[in-house]
Amino acid sequence: MTPTELNLKAKALLETHFDDIVLSGEISKITLHGSGHWYFDLKDERSSIACAMFKGANLKVGFKPAVGNFLELCGSVSLYPESGRYQFIATSMKKAGFGDLEAQFLALKERLQKEGLFDPRFKKSLPKFPKKVGIITSKTSAALQDMLKLIHQKEYFLAKIYIFDALTQGNNAPFSLIQALKKADDMDLDVLIIARGGGSREDLFCFNDENLAREIFKAKTPIISAIGHEIDYVISDFVADFRAPTPSAAIDTLFYSKLDIEQSLDLMEEKLMQLWNYKIQNYENLLLNLSKFFKFNSLPKIIDEKIKQSHNIEKQLNHLLANQMRYNELKLDKLQNAYLQHENFFNKSKKFICIRKNGKIANLEDLKSDDIVILSSQTSQKEAKIL
């Protein structure tokens, strides 16, 4: 038996026993081909299978399937004899809810949004002309080469580029990305780009890691998230300070080309000239108005008016000073009279004597023979005995 004979027998066997069946699972990869045919992988917790839905059948589907969609397909299993590869040929398709990846993504997105990690108030502004730029990505990736090539094409030589190598796919990618982010955030960069080229939903899922999202939120450096293609959204896009649809778009957003800078300088020069001309016109108008004023108001007359104003001010000041002096004199007289009254009372009270018996002030009628008393004046005191 030849490979062709075996494949043909297997094809007949599969198409006989697996005809008109229902298949449910989550899309993990998909290609919407230019021919109109759809090619995708459907997976469950442990396995995946290649699927195809040809143009004649998918025209009846009312939506465009995407990675993460959980689908219910009707169709049959077939085998391609030339390669021996078997696949599921779908004749109908409908959504059956969300797949595991999509459900995890939406749940985390909702929770972080409630915590405020996506709040625009916390977004940091991107620098106008960055001088120190960090890029976190795989150092062997095509995305990095595209970004560096675009920077060179723009002839933007103001910035120094720092590359931080990190995994951008797989279970270990979140930890690798976090370590690179911490290192970059300590280097006082002007801005930081987290980048990865396109891939399946599973390939990009490391950028939906909660710990990575929290590190991005805590970072003091402004961060651009540039993951996948324009249709791809990950958690890092929402928590970063700016989302670029692609890595190349991040460069376009951040860097001006030499031509852009020249045009910007020309525009600034034009605005400065307009402002300068406006100022000159204002000063010319002011001089014209002043010349008209002095023409109708001679200088001696203006000086006389100013002298009269100064005389009036002098009179007002003299009047205020005189009133203040009279007020101070009256206040001084009152204080002097009060002092004299207190002084007279003090002199008279020197002759007064206070009698105390048993520590209390006593009247003469309260005293008896042999009582011991204390006689006190302002200057001395004596003990005495009543006869």
Swiss-Prot record:
GO molecular function: exodeoxyribonuclease VII activity; nucleic acid binding
Source taxon at top rank: Bacteria
Extent of the signal sequence: none
The EC number(s) this enzyme carries: 3.1.11.6
Keyword Hydrolase among UniProt keywords: yes
GO BP annotation list: DNA catabolic process
Keywords for this protein: Cytoplasm, Exonuclease, Hydrolase, Nuclease
Chief site of localization: cytoplasm
Species whose genome carries this gene: Campylobacter jejuni subsp. jejuni serotype O:23/36 (strain 81-176)
Encoding gene (name): xseA
Cited InterPro entries: Exonuc_VII_L (IPR003753), Exonuc_VII_lsu_C (IPR020579), OB-fold_nuc-bd_dom (IPR025824)
One GO CC annotation: cytoplasm
Function of the protein: Bidirectionally degrades single-stranded DNA into large acid-insoluble oligonucleotides, which are then degraded further into small acid-soluble oligonucleotides.
Pfam family, one: tRNA_anti_2
The protein's name: Exodeoxyribonuclease 7 large subunit
Family: Belongs to the XseA family.
Catalytic reactions on record: Exonucleolytic cleavage in either 5'- to 3'- or 3'- to 5'-direction to yield nucleoside 5'-phosphates
Quaternary structure (record): Heterooligomer composed of large and small subunits.
Localization terms from the record: Cytoplasm
